[in-house]
Regions:
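Glycine-rich anion-binding loops of enzyme active sites
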Residues: 1-33, 104, 108, 122-125
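Short acidic, glycine/serine/threonine-rich loops at helix termini
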Residues: 12-17, 29-30, 35-39, 72-76, ...
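Intrinsic low-complexity, intrinsically disordered segments enriched in polar/basic residues
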Residues: 13-14, 44, 163
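A glycine- and small/hydrophobic-rich beta-loop-beta segment
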Residues: 19, 24-30, 35-60
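Glycine-/charge-enriched secondary-structure boundary and capping motifs
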Residues: 47, 51-168
Length: 168
């Protein structure tokens, strides 16, 4: 388990869950060198731009990409408000599964995408349907949540079959 703490104005902080059907999802990768190491001078510029877009209310939600790639990030973003995603036809599976540590998936309104001003890959569109659509493949949100919860269900059960006490 790890976590980080920082100080910020609450008005400058966003949450990771998807906000609205019709919004676009974009993967923003940090610049890396031939050895796949971050080019820190360029990374700083990318992070500064993301921060400005968040403060300006342009980026609606964001999630840091981890070991499960953009696919994991998008799924966890969708779980919060139970919104679905249709991935763009141009997106390949490797675009979604490559870890790309230090990078982000961001949600923006369609009308604001041109304001990004940093390289990004359009991943797809947020929908109000409770499913993920990638080409001909469809996974319901319920299936995805159940699969996500399953590994730790025995350790941290989300429900019990014990006696229920009704309190007046």
């Amino acid at each position: 388990v790890s976590f980080a703490v920082d100080v910020a104005k609450t008005t400058d902080v966003i949450t990771p869950e998807l906000k609205r059907a019709g919004n676009r999802l974009i993967r923003i990768c940090i610049p890396t060198d031939a050895y796949n190491l971050p080019i820190y001078s360029e990374v700083k510029k990318v992070y500064q731009r993301i921060t400005k877009l968040i403060k300006d209310g342009i980026i609606k939600s964001a999630y840091a990409i981890g070991g499960g790639g953009a696919l994991e990030a998008v799924a966890k973003m969708a779980f919060g408000n139970k919104l679905g995603v249709i991935f763009d036809e141009e997106v390949e599976l490797k675009d979604l599964t490559d870890p790309k540590f230090g990078s982000f998936v961001v949600e923006m309104s369609t009308r604001d995408v041109h304001k990004l001003a940093i390289p990004g890959l359009m991943l797809g569109e947020v929908t109000d349907k409770h499913e993920f659509v990638f080409g001909d493949e469809v996974v319901t949100l319920e299936e995805a949540i159940d699969t996500w919860k399953k590994p730790l269900e025995k350790v941290f059960p989300t429900s019990s079959e014990g006696d229920q006490i009704i309190v007046d």
